[in-house]
């Protein structure tokens, strides 16, 4: 019978969150998790809870600019995505969050 079990969850700091945000696209999830000494599932869950996208889109600044301008002109996300050959999610990230 085990009576003295402790929960060893990591207490996430602001620095941890800033590290993740700064290294998305530069390091893999596995590398970031290793550096922070956490499981990849814990890192993914933390990122999801704090609205940090771990998806890496390799989109040029010019294409991002075009997406924003097309959206300002009234085009729908799905139309822009089709024209730019991007996913709806990628275009939404660019347009709404300034990715």
Swiss-Prot record:
GO terms for cellular component: host cell cytoplasm. Induction: Expressed in the early phase of the viral replicative cycle. Expression of early genes is repressed by viral Repc (latency) and favored by viral Ner protein. Its main location: host cell. It comes from the Viruses. It comes from Escherichia phage Mu. Keywords: Early protein, Host cytoplasm. This is Uncharacterized protein gp9. It is found in: Host cytoplasm.
């Amino acid at each position: 019978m085990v009576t003295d079990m402790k929960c060893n969850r990591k207490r996430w700091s602001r620095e941890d969150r800033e590290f993740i945000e700064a290294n998305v696209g530069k390091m893999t999830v596995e590398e970031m998790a290793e550096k922070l000494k956490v499981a990849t599932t814990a890192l993914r869950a933390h990122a999801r809870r704090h609205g940090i996208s771990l998806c890496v889109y390799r989109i040029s600044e010019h294409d991002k600019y075009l997406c924003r301008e097309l959206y300002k002109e009234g085009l729908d996300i799905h139309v822009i995505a089709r024209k730019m050959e991007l996913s709806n999610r990628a275009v939404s990230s660019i347009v709404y969050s300034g990715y």
